[in-house]
């Protein structure tokens, strides 16, 4: 492992006897309980609350403006610059703050299951439960390789509150990435998901330099090597749909696509668990055992029983657990190139078909568009679904220009024989508020049919507005459900709503003037 020269203050903190290194999960649970950071549930999981911040705070995320990365960053509302001087000053304040604590936790983990692209990570935490979370989410065993990648260091101090007037932040919370110093600095927020997504942002910057497409997707495969990718924003079903009893899980959220195939960036899963039941998601249910972390799930203090139906603290309730907690997980999580790709969207308008086939040009169009709905709880201030477009189904985590990632996907689709499907896990029979959420059992049936090739010979009809190729039949799904206008009570209302969404697609796509005409024409039709 190539070691970067760290600051003397950071080295001093890491070498201090008050900093506890490489503690196992059992000891971290014990420390968390002793420090009143959480409680045990009846299944042995550690239940914690994250306070004010129950989701990511994207407005408080910054990238340090540095010469080595300046020209490669897509600066804007997502990637906001902060000066190196301001960052270093704040970093030193945080390190001095952690120095005063009675105990800190430090470990080495890794991002990237493929040895050729594995990034070493040192993570330093104020909270025992944050350290447990990171231990379960990052890869724990180093691959037998020496790829020369310099390690990144996460410094997490959730109880340190920044002063915007002094520290140059927007609020008390901050997530700052320095590619030159190889540091991720997090403070003011107890939401552990910030660590996971910051590392993903780092990998989204580093991997393209090695010819690898980083992807916000889940992935699974069969024993025969038929790999599938599931793209989609938070809450669209990536984790749920990739946890199939009939397929081997590669990972639930973050992957790389190299010339050799697919690899997981992480070593664990971070599943949404609002409404979780053993019947609907048995693998996730069983994974919530000792060593797992439950975020913001209401727990009965007398019985220790979690109430997965409750959104009292947030709709964004989460479970973090290691990949090996899934019985059929593929370990190490490396597989061949995909045979099928599924774009997941939770359509709040209720007008997109539950499943449709995409041409290569349509796949590029919908990848660039990244349409879905922001779902309650995944970000602060979101309480109802809201139509949104997130380029490459992961715009908040992309430091580079979207066109770079889209071009890479286009090249992959060109080189491999991959069938792409668009699957709507959102509403049917009406928009949000009047329609109903498509049943998970139906979505599972459609996905299984797509992956098993059962739709290959089924007749399709072209949707007159969206231009999508919709199968007329799918095993296990009512035929009328496949055509949205047939399940709306008011067809005129459907038509108006569909045209409204089509217009939003066109307005959003104006942000990609360099897109080929063949891709632009693959979108919805307004006339």
Swiss-Prot record:
One of its GO terms (molecular function) is ATP binding. Pathway: Carbohydrate biosynthesis; gluconeogenesis. GO terms for cellular component: cytosol. Its EC number is 4.1.1.49. Binds 1 Mn(2+) ion per subunit. It is found in: Cytoplasm. Belongs to the phosphoenolpyruvate carboxykinase (ATP) family. This is Phosphoenolpyruvate carboxykinase (ATP). The lineage of its organism: Bacteria, Bacillati, Bacillota, Bacilli, Bacillales.
